[in-house]
Structures are given as structure tokens and as C-alpha cells.
């Protein structure tokens, strides 16, 4: 999937004086070349700190922040969004309260990710509550998601062997 450049975020960083448009274009090209999110590039190049970027995203998109230490993945959450969707769209469910699914999202401007969440919500009769998350925390959630998916898979294998 091609990297989606968050134009509203770029404009906000320029407005705040943290980035000049000429450099923004260079970083956008680098993000595409390295197949990384623009925010990751900006953090790696010390344009903005991870924490400042997260705070700016939260304020800009009017979304709460979620941190990895607040996330307790369990097998029920895995049923809501597949690992493939998590990896492809950079969204991760982290809590379900009634019919509200709380989801961490890296790029709230990614229309494809938002459409995927809308589809999932409609398909499962859920409401989606989006939260922004930083890159390091998202990677930790992905790792936990992967290991939990593997554990559930192994448990299902054992059950089918015992039943068979």
C-alpha cells in the first residue's frame, strides 16, 4: 500500500514553524522511498519528537491519545479486526466496551484506513472510537497482537487434535 501523506498534519507543522514546505516535500519523498509513515521520518530526522508529534495529532484531529501501557490485548479483541487489517491499515483495536470498539490509529488522515474501520463497524454493528498512538507503541501492539494470534492459533490446533 502506498504511503499516505497526512497533508493536514504537514500544514500544521508548517504553521507551527516546525517544518518548512520545501523540507516537507523532501521528507514526503523520503517517506515514500523508504515505505515509512511521514511521522516516522520526521521523528528519525529530529524534526519533531515522538511525544510532540503525538500531542499535535491529538489536538489537530480531536482524538484522545492511547499509550501502550494502557492497552491490554485479549483474544476477544482479536476477533474484531484481523492481523492483516492491523498490519495493512495501521489500526489496532485495544478495548471493547459494549458495542464500542476502541481503536488506535497511526494516520487519522488515511481515508482507506477510515473506510476499513467504517466497514468493520457496520459489519459488526459496532461504533468505533479512534485514538492516536505513537509509532513505537503501535509497533509494540503489533508484536503483542502477533504473539497473541499465534497463541490462539496453537490453542485451536491443540483443541482440534484432541477432538480429532
Report each predicted region and the residues it spans.
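N-terminal, intrinsically disordered, highly charged
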Residues: 2-164
